[in-house]
């Protein structure tokens, strides 16, 4: 056998012999999108397994209904943790393993801080550490990184095949794409993402009607317009998110959004440099979808946020590690190093803020010269 094989879970059947323990290690990536049944034959082929995933992102799509699933569990006396429709491989592993066997990857390297900070607080309990290299962000001329909301007072229509779309948002998105790539000749990657299939299809159709825009987007901007599922694992320099919801939004659309916060998390965190939200901000602020209402509040606060830390807090006077914000994110090694440096006469400032980053230990000389110890 080759020392390393890379296959999808469904293609393994025709590519890998069905024999026990033929691999020393099986690595399952995007495990929140893997159903349990499809992975069992792969587990049979391996001695050990590493399961990697994020249960705050997209789950697998079940081919059976919840009612069918429950009936099968009851018929064969199988515990709910093995539910095909409700639980992924990640969920199962997370439930049966001890906390000591779990490793959390907390450093975030993709997005500008304002973009990821909402998801960090809303979905990840503030545990992520932002480590994005801002020097690699691709920005349009004279534009800053971050979140921009284009307020559109539209009207929602319901197609015969279900879902929802908003022509007012579609027209505004075409205008914004023209501004970015035709007027400003932006060369970075661009994506347009929406929760609703009909909205994505109509945006794509609208782009088809503007040949110059279509040619630029698909040849120079690695462009993608689709629903959230097509963006899992992907990223773009600029993401335009079309919320769709506004006046006359069908009740079913609101229920769908309420139950799919993980889709919203994936959608907005695909953006590296700029997240542009196109939608009715007033409607979204009271739409009865909690995470959407929180996001509106967050974006409104961004414009009013002032960062002016008190420099007096940056000179600890004792060898005891100080009480800093988000103390749960500080490792025991950081605390130990702080103490040993203090004993050696080297005074450091823990969790020193620089823009949206927090330096583990900073050495500050005369309020000017700074050294970061990570």
How would you label these PLM feature ranges?
Residues 34-86:
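Signature of the SF2 helicase/ATPase Hel1-core->accessory helical subdomain module
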Residues 80, 86-156, 162:
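Interdomain helical connector at the RecA1-RecA2 junction of SF1/SF2 helicase-like NTPases
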